[in-house]
């Protein structure tokens, strides 16, 4: 399972590539991760204002809300240039103009949620 240092390294690695970029599309190849992935089409055209971490969750803040990503036991995020073909365990692409943020999760224990409002009010982050 990615521990806090790995999650922070992931955040720091993806932030310069996607902060300030507009999400043009997303493609969910495998809806059955830890919980079903259901992203609203309304996030297309929204800009990623910030990339943060709360515990082991990565937060992609947008004007209408926040994408909350957990890498599970074996998940990873990577920046993919152009239209690189997905591998077997690439379950989600968040597409921007010139690149994609790709979630790879062989064991499918990761999760991706969209939450309107502040992420601290989402049931996964609420204390």
What is the meaning of each model-derived region?
Residues 1-62, 95-97:
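Extended, highly charged segments
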Residues 67-127:
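Phosphate/anion-contacting hairpin/loop surfaces
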């Amino acid at each position: 399972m990615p521990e806090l240092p790995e999650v922070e390294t992931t955040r720091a690695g993806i932030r310069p590539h996607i902060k300030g970029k507009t999400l043009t599309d997303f493609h969910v190849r495998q809806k059955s991760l830890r919980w079903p992935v259901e992203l609203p089409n309304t996030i297309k055209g929204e800009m990623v204002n910030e990339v943060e971490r709360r515990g082991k969750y990565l937060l992609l803040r947008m004007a209408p809300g926040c994408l909350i990503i957990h890498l599970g036991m074996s998940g990873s995020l990577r920046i993919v240039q152009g239209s690189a073909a997905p591998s077997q365990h690439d379950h989600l692409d968040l597409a921007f103009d010139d690149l994609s943020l790709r979630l790879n999760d062989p064991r499918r224990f990761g999760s991706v949620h969209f939450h309107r409002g502040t992420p601290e009010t989402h049931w996964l982050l609420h204390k």
